[in-house]
């Protein structure tokens, strides 16, 4: 139970740190500090990934990788009415974002909240409110500020290219279920920290050297595209696919 509590605490902590692909420095800093507290050395790559080193009994090295970056959005343009047009970071299922809360993160790290909405948001006004296709081209972001023009938004410091983080809605139920956006793959990162905690707490020295790689660009296609040559074997820890004729369920661990 204590280990479960630790893993859930790590999960809640990193879920609270917004990290769409390309904006992962803060969550990597958290992971780095946690690894140091457990007594492990780390290294940041030029790409921004974090490597955590565990000494083993021989020279063979096994790598584990999980990604801490998530899907997200980005300001495409500021519209004349003070709302934001957006594009996607990675491949979010855009229709599910209608009505979701979000944060706009400026270059100066000022954070503004907002809501992702359809361009026909009110059933009482728009005849196509129910039927309009939800896509980046037919949706916008309403900022939680009094803004009525492009100039009003620019005065806030919001620019094209600013990151937009989607509310994770993280919930841990009394029955033990975890509901959240971006469990892919922050849940796996939390589990790997549970492994590190066990190794540290029980003073276990594994047979082989271990390198845990926390990657930062998986959702845009090149998370661990480079693996250091000293790693002989790599185990990727990520979410499994469920549905159609696939044999797995939410209660399984899939080994590929």
Outline where the language-model segments fall.
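N-terminal hydrophobic/helix-forming segments and targeting peptides
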Residues: 1-256
């Amino acid at each position: 139970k204590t280990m479960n509590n630790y893993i859930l605490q790590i999960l809640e902590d990193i879920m609270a740190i917004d990290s769409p692909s390309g904006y992962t420095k803060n969550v990597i800093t958290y992971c780095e500090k946690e690894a140091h507290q457990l007594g492990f050395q780390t290294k940041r790559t030029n790409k921004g990934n974090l490597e955590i080193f565990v000494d083993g009994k021989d020279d063979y090295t096994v790598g584990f990788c999980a990604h801490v970056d998530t899907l997200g959005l980005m300001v495409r343009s500021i519209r004349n009415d003070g709302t934001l047009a957006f594009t996607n970071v990675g491949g979010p299922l855009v229709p599910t974002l209608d009505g979701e809360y979000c944060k706009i993160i400026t270059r100066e790290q000022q954070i503004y909240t907002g809501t992702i909405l359809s361009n026909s948001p009110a059933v009482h006004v728009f005849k196509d409110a129910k039927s309009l296709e939800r896509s980046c081209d037919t949706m916008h972001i309403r900022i939680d500020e009094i803004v009525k023009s492009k100039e009003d938004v620019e005065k806030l410091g919001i620019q094209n290219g600013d990151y937009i983080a989607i509310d994770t809605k993280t919930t841990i139920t009394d029955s033990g279920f975890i509901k959240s956006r971006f469990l892919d793959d922050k849940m796996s990162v939390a589990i790997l920290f549970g492994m590190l905690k066990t190794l540290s707490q029980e003073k276990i020295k594994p047979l082989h050297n271990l390198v845990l790689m926390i990657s930062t660009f998986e959702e845009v296609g090149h998370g661990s595209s480079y693996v250091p040559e000293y790693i002989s074997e790599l185990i990727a820890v990520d979410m499994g696919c469920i549905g159609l004729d696939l044999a797995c369920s939410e209660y399984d661990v899939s080994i590929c």
